[in-house]
C-alpha cells in the first residue's frame, strides 16, 4: 500500500519523494501501483476547482461535435481569406494540453491544421536567436497552427530546471511581448492558453500514466524531477502571466481538473474571438467563466 503520511520514509533506491502540500508532509511513490487515498479523494477539487464532478459524457460529446463543426467553418473561412491563426498551449505538466489540441484538430483538415511540438534545440538552434526555430514553423496563408508548448519554455521549465541563465530568463520576459506584437502586426491571430490543475490532480495523472501501459510514454524523467518543484513552477507561472499578458498576446487561463470542461471552453474561446462566415452563436454557447478567465488575476 502506498504511504500516505510522513514521517514514513521512502524506500532506499525508490523514486518516492516527500512533498509539502497544504502544510502537511506527504510521501508519494509513483512506482507503487496503489494510488494514495489522500490523492484520490482530493484530486478533483484540488486548487479550489469549482465543480464536484466531471461534465456528463453525453453532454460533452454533443457539445464538442457542435464546436468541431464550427471549427470546420473556420477552416473554410481561413482558406478563402488567407487568414492565419496560431494557438499556444502551455500549462502544468499533465494539465491536458495535448488533449485540448486533439479535441480542436480532430475533425479539421490536416492539410491546413498543423501541430508543432518541438524537441530540445539542436546545437545549431542553440546558437540562433531564441525565437528563430519557432518562427520557422509559423502559419502560411489559410493555416491554423497549434503549439504543444512553445517559446514559453523559457518562462517555466528552463529557469526552474537550470536550462537557461537568469539573464536569459529576464531577457525573454522583456522580449516576448515585443515578439508577440510583431506577430499581431503581421496579421496573425494569436491565442495563448495556460491550463492549470491542482497538485493532487497532477499527482493522480502522473500515477495513471506510470501504471497504464498505453500512457506510460507520456511520463518523462523531467516529470519525476519536477515533482518536488511545484512552488518553483508556481512562481514562474505567476511571473510569466504578469509580464506577458498584453493587448497583443493576452493569456486565457483555464482550470483544467476536468478535461472535458477544459476542452470545451478552449474551443469556445477561440470560436468566440474569430469573426468567420456562417458563425452559429447558439451552437458555440457561452464560455464558462468559472473555468476560463483572463490573465494573472484569474487564479487568485
UniProtKB/Swiss-Prot annotation:
Obligatory cofactor(s): Mg(2+)
Tree of life domain: Bacteria
InterPro entries reported for this sequence: P-loop_NTPase, PPK2-related, PPK2_PA0141
Top EC category: transferase
Cofactor binding summary note: Has low activity with Co(2+) or Ni(2+).
Outcome after substituting residue 202 to A: Loss of activity
Result of changing residue 149 to A: Loss of activity
EC number of this enzyme: 2.7.4.-
SUPFAM superfamilies: P-loop containing nucleoside triphosphate hydrolases
Keywords attached to this entry: ATP synthesis, Kinase, Magnesium, Transferase
The reaction(s) this protein catalyses: [phosphate](n) + ATP = [phosphate](n+1) + ADP; [phosphate](n) + GTP = [phosphate](n+1) + GDP
Effect of residue 194 to A: Strong decrease in activity
Effect ascribed to mutating residue 263 to A: Almost no change in activity
GO molecular function, one term: identical protein binding
UniProt keyword Electron transport, yes or no: no
pH effects: Optimum pH is 8.0-9.5.
Quaternary structure, from the entry: Homotetramer.
Protein family (similarity comment): Belongs to the polyphosphate kinase 2 (PPK2) family. Class I subfamily.
Protein name: ADP-polyphosphate phosphotransferase 1
Amino acid at each position: 500500500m502506498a504511504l500516505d503520511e510522513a514521517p514514513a520514509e521512502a524506500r532506499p533506491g525508490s523514486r518516492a519523494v516527500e512533498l509539502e502540500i497544504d502544510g502537511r508532509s506527504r510521501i508519494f511513490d509513483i512506482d507503487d501501483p496503489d494510488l494514495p487515498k489522500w490523492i484520490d479523494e482530493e484530486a478533483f477539487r484540488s486548487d479550489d476547482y469549482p465543480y464536484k464532478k466531471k461534465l456528463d459524457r453525453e453532454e460533452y460529446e454533443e457539445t464538442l461535435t457542435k464546436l468541431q463543426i464550427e471549427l470546420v467553418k473556420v477552416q473554410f473561412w481561413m482558406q478563402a481569406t488567407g487568414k492565419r491563426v496560431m494557438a499556444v498551449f502551455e500549462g502544468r505538466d499533465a494539465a491536458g494540453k495535448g488533449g485540448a489540441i486533439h479535441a480542436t484538430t480532430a475533425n479539421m483538415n490536416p492539410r491546413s491544421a498543423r501541430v508543432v511540438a518541438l524537441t530540445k534545440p539542436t546545437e545549431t538552434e542553440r546558437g540562433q536567436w531564441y525565437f528563430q526555430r519557432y518562427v520557422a514553423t509559423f502559419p502560411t496563408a489559410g493555416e491554423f497552427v497549434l503549439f504543444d508548448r512553445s517559446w514559453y519554455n523559457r518562462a517555466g521549465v528552463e529557469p526552474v530546471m537550470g536550462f537557461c541563465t537568469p539573464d536569459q530568463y529576464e531577457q525573454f520576459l522583456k522580449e516576448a511581448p515585443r515578439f508577440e506584437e510583431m506577430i499581431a502586426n503581421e496579421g496573425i491571430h494569436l491565442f495563448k492558453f495556460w491550463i492549470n490543475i491542482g497538485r493532487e490532480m497532477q499527482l493522480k495523472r502522473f500515477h495513471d500514466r506510470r501504471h497504464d501501459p498505453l500512457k506510460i510514454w507520456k511520463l518523462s524523467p523531467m516529470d519525476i524531477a519536477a515533482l518536488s518543484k511545484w512552488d518553483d513552477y508556481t512562481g514562474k507561472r505567476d511571473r510569466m502571466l504578469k509580464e506577458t499578458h498584453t493587448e497583443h498576446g493576452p493569456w486565457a487561463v483555464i482550470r483544467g481538473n476536468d478535461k472535458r470542461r477544459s476542452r470545451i471552453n478552449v474551443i469556445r474561446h477561440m470560436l468566440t474571438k474569430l469573426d468567420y462566415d456562417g458563425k452559429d452563436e447558439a451552437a458555440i454557447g457561452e464560455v464558462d467563466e468559472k473555468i476560463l478567465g483572463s490573465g494573472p488575476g484569474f487564479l487568485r
